[in-house]
Amino acid sequence: MTALPSSAPPLLAAHALTYSRNAIPILGPLHFHINPGEALIVQGPNGIGKTTLLRILAGLLHSDSGHIHINTHHNTTAPERTRHIAYLSHLPGLKQDLSALENLHFLNALHGCHPQRTPSNALTIVGLTDHAQTLVRQLSAGQKKRLSLARLWLSPAPLWLLDEPYANLDPEGITLLNHILTTHLHTQGGTLLTTPGALPTLPVPTRLLHLQKAP
């Protein structure tokens, strides 16, 4: 898994990040970067701090020390980061009493939409056209996961942070996610994704960051 050289500045660079909880070290010090067109895969067992790292990068938690540069800007605030980052947690983050299509329109109003994509197109991409008017609470777990992928496909953000995106996906869903990721990276986007075990195989430049217990 090797990355191709890039002359463009990194989409994200982290330097000496540390984080502790109740005086117990959880992360760090961590140093890494994500270039346009590549994926950084963060691997480590459950409880090692993968989700914590993503929340720090998304601006939802504060690191104890270290620096984060996003599009060369130093330690941007959470509202500024939302313009550059799409964060997909292990929870769907969907409105249960809205339809699948209404959810996508609602999220687009909050975060913006890729200029060449529409919610209806997104539902077609993930195979949910027939469920456009179905309330989210009536969708299966697999369908909710696909709707989350539709939300990701619509995002205009250049950097995607994905918390165990391959969890609970069937083979067709894995193929779909690989297609969405590959399309994003081929347009010089970047992604950081976490996995507790086996590494996903992507036809794009990738690097590995293996998290270990903080000293």
Curated annotation (Swiss-Prot):
Residues 12-215 form the ABC transporter domain. ATP binds at G44, P45, N46, G47, I48, G49, K50, T51. Pfam families: ABC_tran (PF00005). It comes from the Bacteria. PROSITE patterns: ABC_TRANSPORTER_1, ABC_TRANSPORTER_2, CCMA. GO terms for molecular function: ABC-type heme transporter activity; ATP binding; ATP hydrolysis activity. This is Cytochrome c biogenesis ATP-binding export protein CcmA. It comes from Xylella fastidiosa (strain Temecula1 / ATCC 700964). The gene is ccmA.
